[in-house]
Amino acid sequence: MAEPDVSDTNTALKKSGEPGMELENNKATSGAVVTEAGFNTRKLWPDLIKLPSNRWVYSCKEIVDRLGTDPKAAQLTKKKMEKCLMYFYMIKKNLRLFDHTYTAACILFFRYWYIYELPQSLQDCIHLSQAILATACKAMENNRPLDMYVKATCEFMMKDLAQQQRGRQNMDKLKWDVRDKLVRYEKQLLCQFGFDLDLQNPKELIEEIFSGFYRFNRDNIMDEEFKKLFPKILAEARNFIIQAGTQPVSLLCDGYTFTALALLFAGLQYKRSTAPNFRFPRHFFQERFPIRITGPMIVNLFTDYRILEDNFFDLKSNKGDKLEVTNEEVQSLIDEEPTDETVPNPYDYELIKDGVCSQEFLDHTESKLKELTEKIISESLKKRPVIDDNTPKDDTKRVKM
């Protein structure tokens, strides 16, 4: 089993320690700081560091086989995994984190489990999960102060202790231990992942692909009837992504395929329950995703998802028979042009760098900014009521009784 590629990073660090050596394509510039001993900061920390990129996609059989052949060991592993996923969910609620931060933590968690397996003790699994969540928060720009992670983690761990053990537990000592473990595990995680935090988070992708910019500049030509019902499909797709994150589905495909799978599942449920003639507009996926969508590919992914549900966690959010999909159903849902050519990336910088947008989008953005400004002002006034300067102040001191 191949571990994440960290060769480029390790090579750069090794070269930096050799006297007289310079990193390839990163020679010291005239602005570099050189000490009297000859140490050059640009050798160890160049202006541009090339980070390795890994393809975190595996077959369904490889994922299931990772549980091992021993039923007792597999059951113990799944028990630890369930506890870690519950930790993500509870801390997400307590710290009021974004949904895409929760999905990012789940993605990192399953990647770590597949490559390195989980620690032996359940307590160490919680420490690992805390570091994964903190890393996900930073990657998604949804970070919290260190003490908030520590406090929430300690409260989560205390709930598992018996009443007698809680009384004997030194809370201050536990907090320091949790704090130290967070720092240590976070450093360890970054090294083990090879600093590869390119998550392709489907929850983040679906918000970007259907953001206000594209809604007003690309999707404004869609059929009016489809535009009215599409928000329902989009909401169902968001729920699918969050719920599917609790199973190792993120190991089956890349983020764009995961996002397309969520939209197809939502469209399929709408077609089955409400509108038998429903179909996505022509070239809907070709114009929005840098991947080629085919019927057999989608059917295989739904089948693999069902197999993962049967082998991993029995949850209320499991889709069960809803994942039983035929190629005919998928073909009746999409209208894509079959081609063997590579699908261009619609989000290539060269294609969107001109920044041309419609006036309707500019007006929409301006109205949103005004609403946000008014909201901030009203909230600040509630916290700090306006005081009239002409009101006489009561300077009399209270007498202590």
Curated annotation (Swiss-Prot):
GO CC annotations on file: cyclin/CDK positive transcription elongation factor complex; nucleus
Gene3D superfamilies in alphabetical order: Cyclin-like (1.10.472.10)
The keyword Plastid is annotated on this UniProt entry: no
Main location: nucleus
InterPro entries from the UniProt entry: Cyclin-like_sf
GO terms classed as biological process: DNA-templated transcription termination; positive regulation of DNA-templated transcription, elongation; positive regulation of transcription by RNA polymerase II; sno(s)RNA transcription; transcription elongation by RNA polymerase II
Stored SUPFAM superfamilies: Cyclin-like
Record flagged with keyword tRNA processing: no
Region (Disordered): 1-25
Keywords: Cell cycle, Nucleus, Transcription, Transcription regulation
One example GO MF annotation: cyclin-dependent protein serine/threonine kinase activator activity
Compartments where found: Nucleus
Protein task: Component of the BUR kinase complex involved in transcription regulation. This complex phosphorylates the UBC2/RAD6 ubiquitin-conjugating enzyme (E2), leading to monoubiquitination of histone H2B and the silencing of telomeric-associated genes. Also required for histone H3 methylation. Necessary for the recovery from pheromone-induced growth arrest in the cell cycle G1 phase. The kinase activity of the complex requires the presence of BUR2. Overexpression of BUR2 interferes with mitotic chromosome segregation.
Subunit structure: Belongs to the BUR kinase complex.
Record-given protein name: Protein BUR2
Protein species of origin: Eremothecium gossypii (strain ATCC 10895 / CBS 109.51 / FGSC 9923 / NRRL Y-1056)
